[in-house]
Amino acid sequence: MNLTLFATEGFGLNFNLFETNILNWAVVVFGLYKFLPGFLGKMLQKRREGILLELKDAEDRLLNATQALEKAKKDLSSAEEKASQIKADSLKRSESIRMESEKKAIEEMARIKQSAISDESSEASRAISQLRKEAVELAIKKALDSLPNRLDKTTQENLVTQSINNIEVN
């Protein structure tokens, strides 16, 4: 009887052990059962170790990055504090320089004013001195011009005697 005819007409099982390759399947399944867990287990174990190593490396990098970020934040806040301190110091310094410049300008203006007053005073003093000198010269000239008319011989002798007495007293 031909069993393959029955198989074409529907579902059927072939129970002939040598025709169905059940032995081959059994050997393959047994081999897979026996050797595959060790082979695949080693591959999966290596893969698992690689993944765990990569995870640990990623965690270490994350930790380092977090620490670097914290340090950078501290450095930034320190730099901001230093910048604000420098700004405050520069404002104080510029204010003191401005005040010093104003003080020097006021002192210079006072000195210039005093110099102008001094120049004006000395000029006035020179003018007064010149006027006095001219007045004295004019008075002496006038006195000398009027003296010959007013002095006679006795008055002149009395004047000379009086001048000599004044010199002896001193």
Swiss-Prot record:
Cellular localisation: Cellular thylakoid membrane
GO molecular function terms listed in the Swiss-Prot or TrEMBL record: proton-transporting ATP synthase activity, rotational mechanism
Membrane disposition: Single-pass membrane protein
Major location (coarse): membrane
Pfam families according to UniProt: ATP-synt_B
Domain of life according to the entry: Bacteria
Membrane-crossing segments per the record: 22-41
Keyword Ribonucleoprotein in record: no
Region (Disordered): 72-98
GO annotations of cellular component type: plasma membrane-derived thylakoid membrane; proton-transporting ATP synthase complex
PANTHER family according to UniProt: ATP SYNTHASE SUBUNIT B, CHLOROPLASTIC (PTHR34264:SF3)
SUBUNIT field: F-type ATPases have 2 components, F(1) - the catalytic core - and F(0) - the membrane proton channel. F(1) has five subunits: alpha(3), beta(3), gamma(1), delta(1), epsilon(1). F(0) has four main subunits: a(1), b(1), b'(1) and c(10-14). The alpha and beta chains form an alternating ring which encloses part of the gamma chain. F(1) is attached to F(0) by a central stalk formed by the gamma and epsilon chains, while a peripheral stalk is formed by the delta, b and b' chains.
Protein family according to the UniProt entry: Belongs to the ATPase B chain family.
HAMAP family per the UniProt record, alphabetical: ATP_synth_b_bprime
NCBIfam families from the UniProt entry: PRK07352.1
Function summary: F(1)F(0) ATP synthase produces ATP from ADP in the presence of a proton or sodium gradient. F-type ATPases consist of two structural domains, F(1) containing the extramembraneous catalytic core and F(0) containing the membrane proton channel, linked together by a central stalk and a peripheral stalk. During catalysis, ATP synthesis in the catalytic domain of F(1) is coupled via a rotary mechanism of the central stalk subunits to proton translocation. Component of the F(0) channel, it forms part of the peripheral stalk, linking F(1) to F(0).
Name the UniProt record assigns to this protein: ATP synthase subunit b
